[in-house]
């Protein structure tokens, strides 16, 4: 079994074996909110299950980590593909999964998405998050000092 691809998206779901994406395929997000912030993302993963691996349950795991190795999210599960009637002998099967994950983003950074099958790394992707223009401006402006009240004599 191998990972064919990992896609980041604003929204993703798999229905009847078909992947539906909205805002998919990005590798960079701009956040216009103060950090730390909560960000909902979706991840779609495609696994290719070889003919000789069908009808065997395999453990899988998806991890999202920052560049310091701090884990932001983890999904555990199992993958098992059967052999549909009429399939050509030897043909691999595709299993697609999609996950919606709320991430707590502490600061602008790069993040890694790692897919594991049976505790072995099978695929990897990465994405970055930066502060939007509004957030950069707020950090650069000095804090305004309160004016002293004027007393009329």
Language-model region placement:
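Contiguous segments within soluble domain cores/interaction surfaces
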Residues: 2-105, 110-117, 121-153
């Amino acid at each position: 079994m191998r990972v064919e691809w990992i896609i980041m998206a604003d929204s993703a779901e798999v229905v009847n074996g078909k992947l539906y994406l909205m805002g998919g395929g990005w590798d960079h997000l701009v956040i216009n909110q103060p950090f730390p912030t909560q960000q909902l993302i979706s991840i779609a993963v495609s696994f290719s299950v070889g003919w000789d691996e069908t009808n065997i349950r395999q453990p899988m795991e998806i991890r999202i980590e920052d560049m310091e190795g701090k884990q932001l999210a983890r999904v555990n599960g199992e993958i098992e593909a059967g052999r549909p009637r009429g399939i050509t002998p030897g043909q691999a099967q595709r299993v697609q999964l999609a996950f919606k994950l709320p991430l707590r983003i502490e600061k602008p950074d790069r993040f890694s998405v790692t897919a594991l099958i049976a505790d072995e790394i099978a695929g990897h992707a990465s994405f970055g998050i930066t502060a939007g223009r509004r957030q950069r401006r707020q950090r650069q402006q000095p804090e305004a000092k309160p004016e002293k009240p004027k007393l009329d004599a």
